[in-house]
Amino acid sequence: MFRNQYDTDVTTWSPTGRLFQVEYAMEAVKQGSAAIGLRSRSHVVLACVNKAQSELSSHQRKIFKVDDHIGVAIAGLTADGRVLSRYMRSESINHSFTYESPLPVGRLVVHLADKAQVCTQRSWKRPYGVGLLVGGLDESGAHLYYNCPSGNYFEYQAFAIGSRSQAAKTYLERRFESFGDSSREDLIKDAILAVRETLQGETLKSSLCTVAILGVDEPFHFLDQEAIQKVIDTFEKVPEEEEGEGEAGEGEAEAAEAAPAERGGGVAGDQDVAPMEM
């Protein structure tokens, strides 16, 4: 039984009860650059990896402002993400105009999930190939949701999507219990450290990541590269200092071993040479 018999139409079920077109859209999310979100009781931080197509091109935006109290980070097809972020912005504006109050984050996420779900039921449409991390703050507190191309949505304390996101998830799973009481600065630091986990040995620089934050009495805004680099320097320089101290200790030990050898004459010198030849 071949898969390609059942994946030509989004409304065709396979005998095992799967919609392959929807699964393909979910795979597209895994191909995009990593996006990370985490929240405390008062703040939400969104971060993403800036991935350029080539050295000659600029990177595409992966984090969008929806309203002063809502932002979204995407992974997958950027064009689909732009369309959905525009839809979210329109919904927020319409709600504010009609009710003269900010749109609750949960309600916006439900509207977004309904829009994505319709695309899994119409033969003339295709699922959106993008995953969205929606972070926001309303009367009930800070929220972080993940919207899936299938139309499902889930609320998280912290989450990561996109390429090599499993490494970031592992880091977040070790730390998430402390996020609720984290300060603004600690939350930003944890977000950047999670981004570093997805780079697989590549040196983390402010040009490689984008960070946005919103919170109580703090509208949604992006951190500038200088602020991001200052945070990076706080944990990138520590290993270098420890390495320098280690090298100094090794140098002192070698000097201490060399002193008796010089006093002992040629025999000690031969003993020093032998291990190097082995």
Curated annotation (Swiss-Prot):
Expression induction: Slightly induced by heat-shock and high intensity light.
InterPro entries reported in the protein's UniProt record: Ntn_hydrolases_N, Proteasome_alpha, Proteasome_alpha-type, Proteasome_alpha1, Proteasome_asu_N, Proteasome_sua/b
PROSITE patterns: PROTEASOME_ALPHA_1 (PS00388), PROTEASOME_ALPHA_2 (PS51475)
One protein family per Pfam: Proteasome
Assigned keywords, A-Z: Acetylation, Cytoplasm, Isopeptide bond, Nucleus, Proteasome, Ubl conjugation
Alphabetized Gene3D superfamilies for the sequence: Glutamine Phosphoribosylpyrophosphate, subunit 1, domain 1
N-acetylmethionine PTM positions: M1
CDD domains with a match to the protein in the record: proteasome_alpha_type_1
Subcellular localization(s) per the UniProt record: Cytoplasm; Nucleus
Effect of inactivating the gene: Enhanced thiol accumulation and arsenic tolerance. Mutation can be complemented by overexpression of PAF2.
Keyword Ubl conjugation annotated: yes
Keyword Nucleus: yes
Record GO biological process: protein catabolic process; response to arsenic-containing substance; ubiquitin-dependent protein catabolic process
Region Disordered, residue ranges: 238-278
Ranges of Acidic residues composition bias in the record: 239-255
One annotated Gene Ontology cellular component of this protein: proteasome core complex, alpha-subunit complex
Highest rank taxon of the organism: Eukaryota
Glycyl lysine isopeptide (Lys-Gly) (interchain with G-Cter in ubiquitin), cross-linked positions: K51
Quaternary context: Component of the 20S core complex of the 26S proteasome. The 26S proteasome is composed of a core protease (CP), known as the 20S proteasome, capped at one or both ends by the 19S regulatory particle (RP/PA700). The 20S proteasome core is composed of 28 subunits that are arranged in four stacked rings, resulting in a barrel-shaped structure. The two end rings are each formed by seven alpha subunits, and the two central rings are each formed by seven beta subunits. The catalytic chamber with the active sites is on the inside of the barrel.
Assigned protein family: Belongs to the peptidase T1A family.
Record function comment: The proteasome is a multicatalytic proteinase complex which is characterized by its ability to cleave peptides with Arg, Phe, Tyr, Leu, and Glu adjacent to the leaving group at neutral or slightly basic pH. The proteasome has an ATP-dependent proteolytic activity. Negatively regulates thiol biosynthesis and arsenic tolerance.
The protein's name: Proteasome subunit alpha type-1-A
Organism lineage string: Eukaryota, Viridiplantae, Streptophyta, Embryophyta, Tracheophyta
Name of the gene: PAF1
